[in-house]
Structures are given as structure tokens and as C-alpha cells.
């Protein structure tokens, strides 16, 4: 064995040495034809059933291999006498009974100490009476259990057509291939001889029974018990089984002969040329057995080939002779080659040999059971085994495709890869996930069938397989050396979106994902994170899922630095992620963390150290293929025999893959070395005076509405001290915005005009229909255009000679907006920036209530259908009014493609934009049909202005006049405010009360002398203070007023006028916080006085007090909103040279991310050219639109209907002159390609500004030195290419390749200031 001398004693140096030894071990295990394979370990049942079979068939004998099998079986017995399903699990009753019977057949006497211990274990655990169905089935074939104790399994099942809800193809592939031979065996009901003779009531195992006199144990509960427990499906299947038993199992039924012939034909059709059936022991063994019972000669070709396939599963090693459940050459080869690609071996001839071996095994065949229900008929998958053409494996196919691309990126568009991708996409289930072998195979009710006590009859979508496919799709979408066509990209993005939605539903409360095919939560979680990592930067929901998971991984790390998990976590969820450390679990956890954290993270370094310290050289021997090689091999690996980390069927069958403990650590070490090597390259720090200006992301806040609306946004922006915030709003709010220290941008318009246009009280839909909304259109169009200008400064007008923050060109990095600012998504899309919507009113489609903007009365509509339609109607009329303007704006100002009405109705609502709702769930809970991107954050705590102090006269009024009611209508427009005040005063006089009126809503009356004596008029007063001194609150139902009243615990009378005021009025009444709402348009003295009396009664006190207590326990919604905005900011990629700066550029050749300053320096130094750089979007909106665009026929029909309706409506409106020139945007589309990209030009100018600013902060010598250091750093980083980018000629990861030889020393270079 070669010696490995490590001169670098750092963790990185040790990791390089460990990786080199692991790679050497891998190459030493490679087969001459290029592939890898290792034995698939499992429990003793397969070996025991192999013994049963050889004992049953006269032509077979156990004389030669019996002693070695006996030695292996006895060696697997545990100290308590049992046999387990896996090394770290307690004994299993069924496995122990089967192993015991096999040993008795092999001649071990029942008086042997090992057998006595086994007997004691079985009896202690309920005896043979408690074994599972398949064990009972095998016992019946020896007369140890009567056949009447076995459920009926009529062969006629195979005759049921595929369109029926029950047929053989609704079963999983493994269940189907195992069940059909069982149908034949069940028909024949054989009874074979045992060493004590042949008998239908054999007492050979009586010592294992608790009550040997009663062996006809029912396989299901009595029918009456099932009825009492409301187990209807179990009842139906059990009743059917009883009926079938009455008719002798239909053995003499006219169709039985046809069914038996079809079973036999099916088996012959599904036998591979090699003799295999599904490459799995149960169908191979069962098919040979069934065909022999059906009359086939043992010397026949089909039986001979089948026996060869069966014997290929046998393994002989130092422990003895045993039988694998299956073989895994394609799986082992794909995973190993994939790992070696990550280790930098792409392009190596040995790896090329492996990938060629994989290409040769692609299943381009015309048969396969998957064809019955798949969404495609294009073949192209890969199987798990050597010979299994009927059941390609989705999981294997994904890994093979990734391996082929990593080894040679030029093959991305090859027929081999594209056929595989086509087949893989066709296997996606309706729920968005993937199963392993079948599509939409989720009929879990089949597990209620009496013979399904292993819960393995279906192959539903699982998180681990879906995560792997998502990883494959992400890799395909990232390719630049051989990029996919737009059509393929669209298909992959749409498929990925469905997969991400599926994974969001499957994530558990801990943040982890259940692992179906590997142990367990660590496996499932690692697979999912490997997939989500490709989409986390552009998909907020994917990012949120990932962030939730990382803390769970931290919490499950063991004290020794590794990770592990017991298989008992499949039974007991409290054990999820817990167990003795193993190499595989540690590697899975590290792979997950390394995709989101720096390699210097403490948890990562401890995990890497565990892998290094637990690596072992091969001294005693190793598996070369499935054969044991004695002596030392080359390299080193990790121990694999102490834990099974693969899963066949949870709680029933677990698998030990030796290479799992080897190849996954290779990937983890490779990723660590790659990231640590990149981190070790010197990083440059810009002068602090420049950093203050440049290291501040630009946040654009678009706001429309009243003073109260703006106050909410101001509360949020106070949490963004690390950002440069620009608030674009009406000129009326300029003083308030600038008074809080934020940049103001004037977009025009007036909240008073908006309020007046909608003050009719009939809702926004009625306003649009009646034409009253028309007067706002021109004003709003102007405002919307101004919002875009606010997002992108005219950079030509900025001079770097003024190094204050406000002089730097403003280009929005994040856009924040309320839902009413309809242009927000267009501006964010053009700026390639993420969007955060902050709302004080429900604006998302739901069936729980209608759109608040369409409500014209204080009452919720019970129709969920109408409620959803109301949101679509609002979107329809909104698009009718502004859609053409938006499209002209998109074409002429934004340089974006036109959109249609179907986009507004069906697509925008599906985009996963973070939507922060600033109200409390105590008042308005989150509807169940809202997605995870919607956050009900809680009310924002309004900060009262310091100059709003109560006067002494007001305080005296409050003390002397009891009870007092506060009255405020915000900034609403009231036609005759004095008349309203006098009306309210009269009502209050009737109930003996006074009022404090806040007149911020109207200043048209001045003379206080005209006011009634029971009215006190104030210009401005903090609601938080005032409401503590009054007994009731009358207001218009604005979100802020409703919140203030609820927080104060005071009863409220709401007088809604328009928009969402009716929604909050209804909520107040619904929650018992005040009287029935009284709309302003229905205000009469006779109605008002009783409401005032009701308001001042004590009937609402308890509900109001409880609500106030609940709200005090809520977090501040402004904090949640601020955190969400900062999360979007933090997600922006950082520059690889100046890590303090955001990277808005990337090099198309190397994918390295660059800040504007670094890019400008490299361009000025002629290292690169601007055409070598592309803008790196902080959010890829084009991908978002393609992802959400549904291709289902139903949605296509709806789109067509909507477009026809829209075309008809716009034509009619055009005839009346409403919409003039509304289709001019089509010319804009034609002109779009010719115009210069304004964003790119702005970023280019900004980059030059930033570099100039940094140069100004340096002295002349440092400025020259800075450019030289940038060039040096750039060249070093080009030699270290990130793992995910495989676009150099060989496809190799240079960082991994170089990591085996050496790396760069860590250093940080500070640029000297003047």
C-alpha cells in the first residue's frame, strides 16, 4: 500500500490526504470493464428462504453449501438469541423464526444452545402466532401452518384491466413482480416434507408456538371488531376474503384456468435474457418456484436461466455463505463515478470507462411496466441491477445523468441524456414528486388488504427521490458549456416548481425530511437540500425550507463531531437524526451544511475531523465486486459493517450498502476542500470610507395611500439601518419621510384624490364599472411610470467627487411595496431584484372571504367560489384599466415582454413572492389555502410623534366628561364633516356621552364655536394615548384604526366607507369587539343613537380585554417584515474578490461573481471585457414566470376563454372611446430588441463610479497596487472553479483536482487609505 506523507498539518491538509486515500481505494475496487459493485447486505430472511427453496426442490441439494450457510446464520445471531433486521436494531420475530427453521433444516438440533436461545426469544415475543404474512406463507408450504390461515389470493387478479381501480399495475413494481408468482403458489397450496416427514399439520416447530394446538391463527380482526372501529376498507377486504374462502378460493371458477395461464405468460414475458426477474430475490425465487409447480421441467431453459440468476445473488466471505436481496452495479457505479467527478477526476480515462459502461446500460427498450401509467412512452432510464429492463429506476437515472454531465458537459444535449431526462420527467407524479419505479402509485388503501402487513404495496412520491431529481434538474439548468434549449428549460423549470411545492408539503415541523430509501431523516434531508440548493437563491420558498433545516442538522450533531441515526427512527420519530456516528450520515450532514455555510463553520470542521479520524486502511481484506479479497488493498475507507444505512421497506427490510460509507464521504471531503481552498485565497478589503457607501444595499419602498399607510412603511424601514432606503410616494408625505431620515422620491399624486374617487361606498368594482374610477387612471399611470424611474437613477448625473451615500447611483437591489402599487412586480422584474409585499389588508386569493376591495357591506359571503371569483374579477378590471399601460411601460421603459390578462389571473398569483401581512392572527387567522410565502406577522407598533402631546384642556375634558367616545376617520374624505359631527353629537347626547374628535380627516371647518358642547376637537393626538382614556372608539374601519382599538382593548363602532374598511368592520363585529357596523352612507340619528348606547355598554368589555392581551403577546410585525427584507438582501451573492460587496456581475466563462468595482477594475486592466460579463440577477423573474405557467389542458382552456372575454370587452370599450391606442405596446415589443438595456447600462456606470470612489479613498500608490491585487486574486480564483460549474474543456473541477496537491494560504489584504 502506498504511503501518504502529509506535510500540511492543518485540517485542510488532513482532508486532502484523506480524500486521496479514499480515491485510491475506489480505483482499487473498480472492475476491469469500468464499473463498481459491492454486496447488498440484508437480514437473514433471504438466506433462510434460499435454504427452504433448495430443500423443497428434489433436484437441489444443501450438502455442499449447507455448512457455510449454517456458519453464516449462526454468526448473525445476537446475544439474546434473535436475528435482527439490521445491526443496530432489536431482534425481529419473523426473521428469527425463519432463521431458526433454516438451521433446523440444515441439521442443527433444537437442543443446541443457539437454538434454545432462539426458542426463548420467540416464545417471549408471542411465538410463531405473531409472525408476518410472508413468514406464515412459507411455514404453510411445510405444513407448519394450515393453508386456511393464509389470506385468499385469487389468480384472477391478473385479469383485471388497467383502467380499474384495482389491478396488478396499481401495485408497486416489487409487489407486482413478487405477487404474481405467489398467486400461482397459493393456487397449488404445496406442502413439502421436513426432516421429520411430510404432513399438512407438521409439529416440526411446535417448540416455537405458545399454543401449538391452535395454529389456524386469524390473519385479521373479526369483522365485528373492524366495524366497531370504523375500519371500513379493512372490513371490506376481510369480508371479501371470507366470501372467497366459502367458494374454495375460486379454484374451480371458470376463469381460473385462464388466470393461471396469464400468470405463467406474464412470468415468461418478464424474464430477462439473463434469467432474472426484476433483479430481486423474491421475484426470482418465487418465479422459479411457481413455474416448477405449474409443470415446467427443472431442465427447461427458463428454469436453468432462473437458477443462474438466483446463484448470482450468493456471496461467500469470511463469515460464510449468504444471499443478497439484490445487486446494485448501476447504482454503485453511478454514485461512485459521481463522487469521483466531485473529487476532480473528470476526464480521467478510468472514469471515462465507467461512464461508458453506464451509457451502454441505458434501457432503450420497447417494454416496461412503467408504460401503463407514465406521462411518456419515451424509454431512456437506467435500472439498479445488471439485468432489469422492465423496471428502470428514477433515482438511478438521475444520478447517471448527473454523472455523465459532470464527466463531460458537452454531452448535456446528447440523445443519451435527453432520452433519460424525457423519461424521468414522464415519471413525475401528479403531486409533483417522484416515486422510485412507478408514477402516481399512491393507492395507500391497498395496505388494508389482509396480506399487506408490510405496507409495501405502493411506490408513492418520496422526498428523497424527489430531492435527487431536483438536484439533477438544477444541474441541467445550470449548464453553460452545452446549454439547454428554451423549450427544455421551460419544461425543467415547470417540473422543478412542482417538485419544490411537493417538498414544501412534505417538510416536517423539525425542518427535516423523511427518507424512504435511506436511513432516515439525515438521508432524506440531505437529498432534498442537494436539490433545493440549486434553486434557493431565486426561489424564496426553497430558501425558507433550507434555512429551517440547517438548525435541525446542528442540533443532531453528536458530541464526537459526527452524525448518525438509528433505524428505530422509522418507528419512533423522537429518535429522528439520533444515533451512533457513521461515515455516511456524517457525509450527508456535511454535504447539506457546506452548500449554505462557510467551511470554517464549527459544525463543519468537527464533522470533517470525524471523517478524517475514522478513516481506516484495508488490512484484513475488502470486497472486490461481490467477492472477498483477503489482505491489504490500496487506499483507505470507512467501516461499513456496523450500520445499515439503506432502506428497502421501512420497519421490514433494511439494506447495507458498503459503498455508502465510502463514496458519500468522498463527496463531502471534496466539497469541503473546494470551499476551503477558495476561502483560503486572499480576500481584499476596500477602504472603510468607501465601504460605508458601497456596502449598503439599495432598498426601494413603493408606497401609496394616506398618512396611516405611510406610517406603517416607516415603521418597517426603521429596521433597515444597514440599507440605503428610498421611499417613493406622494409629495404630501415628503416632510414625514425626510423627517425620519429616509430618502424621498416624488411620484406625484395625492391620497385625497384617491379617497374622493372611491368615497361612494359601493366598492372598487362598482367604481370601475360605473366609471368613477376612470378619473384616476391618468394619474395612476403617471405614478406607476415614476415608480420605475425611482428604481433606477440617471447615473450620468452622479459624480463620484461627492463620496456621500446619496451621490451614488441608486439601483434597487430589493423592491418593497404594498399590494395596491400594481407596478411593483414589473419594476422588480426589470431591476432583476427580489420583491417583498407588505400588506395591511388581505390581498391574496382565498375561498374564506371575498376580496376586501370588492366589499360594499359589512358581511362576509359564505360562497367560497364567489370569494375566489371576487379576487379574479378585481384583477380582471384592474388589468382592463391598466393592462395596456403596463405593457406599453414594460416595452418602452422596462424593456420587458408584454403580458396578457391570463398572466394577471393565473400566473402572478402563483409566484412565490414573500408577502408579509401586518395584522394579528388573533383577529384574522391565516387561511389554509394561502401558501408558505405568506406570513401573518402581527400588527406594527405605531410610533407616536413626539410633538403629539395631549393639551391640558383635553385632559380636563376627559376628566370631567364621562363617558367619552373617541371619533376618528383618518384621512377619509367626508362630504359634510360638520353635519357628521353634529349628528354624532346628537346621538351621544341621547346616551349622555361626549366625544373627542380627531379632525385629521378634514380641516375644512375651523370655527370651534360652532361645535356642540359635548365635542372636543383635536388636530392630532396619538391613538395609543387617547384610547386609554375613553370608553368607546368610532372610526371608519381602516386597518390602523382597527389595530389601535384592538390593542387598547376598547369597544369599537365601525362606520366603513370603502375598500378594506368593510372587511375590518366585519371582523370587529364577528370577534365581538363592538356593535354591528354602520356604514357612513346609512348614517341616521335613529340608527346611530342605539349603536352608541350599545358601544358604551359592558357587553364587549371581556372580548376587548382578551383581544388586547393576545395582541400584547404578538411580536411586532414591523420586525418580521424588516427581517424578511434583510433576508432578501442577505441572499444576494457576494463578490468573490471583495466579499463585503454585492455581486451584480458574473463571468460567463467561469461563473465567478463580481461586484461592480471588481468588474470595472478587471475591464480597465484588460483582463476581461464587458461582453464577457453578464448581470447576475438577484431574482430570476423569467424563470419564475416559466415555472408557474401551467401547461394543463384545463388552464389552457381558461386562458383561451379569458383572452376571448378580454378581447371582446376591450373592443366594446374602444368603441366608446374609453381606451385609445391600447395596443401600442405591440410596437414596443418589436422595438424591444433594438433598444439598449437600461439596467445593464446603469450597472456598468455604477461599477465605474464604485471603482472611482475606491481609488479616491486610496493614495496613488495604493490605487495602483489595488488593481494589481485584484488581477492576482482573479487569476487565482479562475484556477479554482466552483463544484457546480462544469464548463471547462475536460469538465473537471480544478479546485478538487488541485486540492489533492496543495492549496492557498489564508490571508486578508487591506487597501491603505489616504
From Swiss-Prot:
- Compartments where located: Membrane
**Which GO BP terms, alphabetically?**
carbohydrate metabolic process; lipid glycosylation; triterpenoid biosynthetic process
Q: Per its UniProt record, what InterPro entries does this chain match? A: EryCIII-like_C, Glycosyltransferase_28, GlycoTrans_28_N, Hopene-cyclase, SQ_cyclase_C, SQ_cyclase_N, Squalene_cyclase, Terpenoid_cyclase/PrenylTrfase
Concerning SUPFAM superfamilies, the annotation shows:
Terpenoid cyclases/Protein prenyltransferases, UDP-Glycosyltransferase/glycogen phosphorylase
UniProt-annotated stretches for the region Disordered: 1289-1314
Which segments cross the bilayer? 133-153, 155-175, 230-250, 1200-1220
Question: Which parts of the sequence are marked as the site Transition state stabilizer?
Answer: 331, 384, 517
Q: Extract the ranges annotated as region (Terpenne cyclase).
A: 1-680
Composition bias type Low complexity, residue spans: 1292-1302
EC code(s) of this entry:
5.4.99.-, 2.4.1.-
Null allele outcome, as annotated, is: Abolishes the production of enfumafungin and loses antifungal activity.
- Indicate where this protein is primarily found: membrane
Record GO terms (molecular function):
intramolecular transferase activity; sterol 3-beta-glucosyltransferase activity
One CC-aspect GO term: membrane
CDD domains, sorted = GT1_Gtf-like (cd03784)
**PFTB repeat residues:** 19-62, 66-107, 260-300, 417-458, 546-597
Name a Pfam family for this protein.
EryCIII-like_C
Provide the topology term for how it sits in the membrane: Multi-pass membrane protein
Protein's job: Terpene cyclase-glycosyl transferase fusion protein; part of the gene cluster that mediates the biosynthesis of enfumafungin, a glycosylated fernene-type triterpenoid with potent antifungal activity, mediated by its interaction with beta-1,3-glucan synthase and the fungal cell wall. The pathway begins with the terpene cyclase-glycosyl transferase fusion protein that most likely uses 2,3-oxidosqualene as substrate and catalyzes glycosylation immediately after cyclization.
Family the UniProt entry places it in: In the N-terminal section; belongs to the terpene cyclase/mutase family.
What is the official name of this protein in its record?
Answer: Enfumafungin synthase efuA
- UniProt organism field: Hormonema carpetanum
> Which gene is the coding source of this polypeptide chain?
efuA
